Protein backbone atom coordinates (compact mmCIF):
# COMPACT_ATOMS: atom_id res chain seq x y z
CA UNK A 1 0.00 0.00 0.00
CA UNK A 2 2.09 2.89 -1.22
CA UNK A 3 1.75 6.29 0.33
CA UNK A 4 1.22 8.83 -2.46
CA UNK A 5 0.95 12.04 -0.43
CA UNK A 6 1.55 13.46 2.98
CA UNK A 7 -0.63 16.57 3.10
CA UNK A 8 -0.36 18.42 6.41
CA UNK A 9 -1.18 15.67 8.95
CA UNK A 10 -3.05 13.52 6.40
CA UNK A 11 -1.41 10.40 4.97
CA UNK A 12 -2.90 9.42 1.61
CA UNK A 13 -2.53 5.90 0.21
CA UNK A 14 -3.56 3.75 -2.73
CA UNK A 15 -3.84 0.07 -1.93
CA UNK A 16 -2.28 -2.18 -4.56
CA UNK A 17 -4.66 -4.64 -6.24
CA UNK A 18 -7.63 -2.58 -5.07
CA UNK A 19 -10.89 -2.05 -6.95
CA UNK A 20 -12.63 0.62 -8.95
CA UNK A 21 -13.83 3.32 -8.70
CA UNK A 22 -10.63 5.28 -8.32
CA UNK A 23 -10.22 6.07 -4.63
CA UNK A 24 -7.65 6.88 -2.00
CA UNK A 25 -7.42 6.00 1.67
CA UNK A 26 -6.82 8.94 3.97
CA UNK A 27 -5.44 8.48 7.46
CA UNK A 28 -4.98 10.94 10.28
CA UNK A 29 -3.87 9.54 13.63
CA UNK A 30 -5.89 6.32 14.08
CA UNK A 31 -8.80 7.37 11.86
CA UNK A 32 -9.45 6.63 8.18
CA UNK A 33 -11.86 7.35 5.35
CA UNK A 34 -11.97 6.28 1.74
CA UNK A 35 -12.44 9.06 -0.82
CA UNK A 36 -13.92 7.93 -4.14
CA UNK A 37 -13.20 10.19 -7.10
CA UNK A 38 -16.14 10.26 -9.50
CA UNK A 39 -16.46 12.39 -12.62
CA UNK A 40 -20.01 13.45 -13.48
CA UNK A 41 -20.30 15.51 -16.66
CA UNK A 42 -16.56 16.27 -16.44
CA UNK A 43 -16.91 17.57 -12.88
CA UNK A 44 -15.12 15.84 -10.02
CA UNK A 45 -17.32 14.60 -7.20
CA UNK A 46 -15.69 13.20 -4.07
CA UNK A 47 -17.61 10.66 -2.04
CA UNK A 48 -16.24 9.97 1.44
CA UNK A 49 -16.95 6.54 2.91
CA UNK A 50 -16.29 5.16 6.36
CA UNK A 51 -13.86 2.25 6.52
CA UNK A 52 -14.79 -0.60 8.84
CA UNK A 53 -12.69 -0.98 11.98
CA UNK A 54 -11.73 2.71 11.86
CA UNK A 55 -13.28 5.86 13.20
CA UNK A 56 -13.96 8.36 10.41
CA UNK A 57 -12.43 11.77 9.87
CA UNK A 58 -14.45 14.77 11.00
CA UNK A 59 -16.47 16.73 8.46
CA UNK A 60 -13.96 19.60 8.73
CA UNK A 61 -11.11 17.18 7.99
CA UNK A 62 -13.00 15.76 5.00
CA UNK A 63 -13.53 19.28 3.67
CA UNK A 64 -9.80 19.99 3.99
CA UNK A 65 -8.94 16.75 2.19
CA UNK A 66 -11.52 17.49 -0.54
CA UNK A 67 -9.78 20.78 -1.31
CA UNK A 68 -6.48 18.93 -1.65
CA UNK A 69 -7.95 16.13 -3.80
CA UNK A 70 -9.59 18.62 -6.17
CA UNK A 71 -6.30 20.50 -6.53
CA UNK A 72 -4.30 17.31 -7.15
CA UNK A 73 -6.88 15.19 -9.00
CA UNK A 74 -4.80 14.76 -12.18
CA UNK A 75 -1.69 13.74 -10.26
CA UNK A 76 -3.74 11.35 -8.10
CA UNK A 77 -5.17 9.73 -11.24
CA UNK A 78 -1.67 9.42 -12.74
CA UNK A 79 -0.42 7.73 -9.57
CA UNK A 80 -3.47 5.41 -9.54
CA UNK A 81 -2.76 4.38 -13.14
CA UNK A 82 0.93 3.73 -12.45
CA UNK A 83 0.14 1.60 -9.40
CA UNK A 84 -2.97 -0.23 -10.61
CA UNK A 85 -2.37 -0.71 -14.33
CA UNK A 86 1.40 -0.61 -14.81
CA UNK A 87 2.61 -1.94 -11.45
CA UNK A 88 5.08 0.93 -11.24
CA UNK A 89 6.33 2.47 -8.01
CA UNK A 90 5.40 6.04 -7.18
CA UNK A 91 7.13 8.48 -4.90
CA UNK A 92 5.24 9.98 -1.99
CA UNK A 93 5.09 13.75 -2.11
CA UNK A 94 5.05 15.88 1.02
CA UNK A 95 2.92 19.02 0.98
CA UNK A 96 3.32 21.03 4.17
CA UNK A 97 1.52 24.17 3.05
CA UNK A 98 -2.25 24.36 3.39
CA UNK A 99 -4.05 24.79 0.08
Region annotations inferred by a language model:
Residues 1-12:
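Negatively charged, low-complexity tracts enriched in Asp/Glu with abundant Ser/Thr
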Residues 4, 43-51, 72, 76:
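Generic preference for hydrophobic/aromatic residues in regular secondary structure cores
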Residues 10-15, 80:
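Aromatic side chains
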Residues 1, 24-28, 38-40, 49-51, ...:
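General "foldedness" signal
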Residues 53-99:
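Acidic, low-complexity intrinsically disordered segments
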Residues 6, 29-32, 71, 88:
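Residue-identity detector for glutamine
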Residues 15-16, 20-59:
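A short, structured beta-strand/loop element
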Amino acid sequence: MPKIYQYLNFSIYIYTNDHLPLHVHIFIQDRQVKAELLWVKNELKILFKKVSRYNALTSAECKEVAIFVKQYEKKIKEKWDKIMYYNQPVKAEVIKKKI
